[in-house]
């Protein structure tokens, strides 16, 4: 709980004023805010093996501290032996306290555990949101390496209220995300 309070406090005391002066906002309501973090795992192999969904839900719940939900297919695709409403993925949407806890864990613990880590790409979506692809779930400390049956990757999307990529980059950089080729201010 103290981590959450520290990140929120850091945003209010240091990050928000820095962004306000950097972009010359006239109102505090214009300052970009991290709205939510969405973690998604696409599990195409779940068509053949139903147990993968249960394992992925348990792992995602352990990583995020919030119950994961199975995503289902919307239509039949015969070539992939896929039927409508079959579970084919797992996702979690984090907001408020859990969002800040997960962000803290991601930046301070998980990302430094990636092999040959040199920073994350700086590709945004044009509206200030950022998606990070992770190859292995074993970088999180909650996952016991001996008990996993399959290495699974995931997408982590940071949804911000930023209007431009530059504002979103500045916000996430202030939160401590280690971008490659970070611009020196």
From Swiss-Prot:
Family to which this protein belongs: Belongs to the universal ribosomal protein uL5 family.
Function (record text): This is one of the proteins that bind and probably mediate the attachment of the 5S RNA into the large ribosomal subunit, where it forms part of the central protuberance. In the 70S ribosome it contacts protein S13 of the 30S subunit (bridge B1b), connecting the 2 subunits; this bridge is implicated in subunit movement. Contacts the P site tRNA; the 5S rRNA and some of its associated proteins might help stabilize positioning of ribosome-bound tRNAs.
GO CC, any one term: ribosome
UniProtKB keywords: Ribonucleoprotein, Ribosomal protein, RNA-binding, rRNA-binding, tRNA-binding
Entry protein name: Large ribosomal subunit protein uL5
NCBIfam families: PRK00010.1 (NF000585)
Subunit composition and interactions: Part of the 50S ribosomal subunit; part of the 5S rRNA/L5/L18/L25 subcomplex. Contacts the 5S rRNA and the P site tRNA. Forms a bridge to the 30S subunit in the 70S ribosome.
GO molecular function, one term: tRNA binding
Organism: Bacteroides fragilis (strain ATCC 25285 / DSM 2151 / CCUG 4856 / JCM 11019 / LMG 10263 / NCTC 9343 / Onslow / VPI 2553 / EN-2)
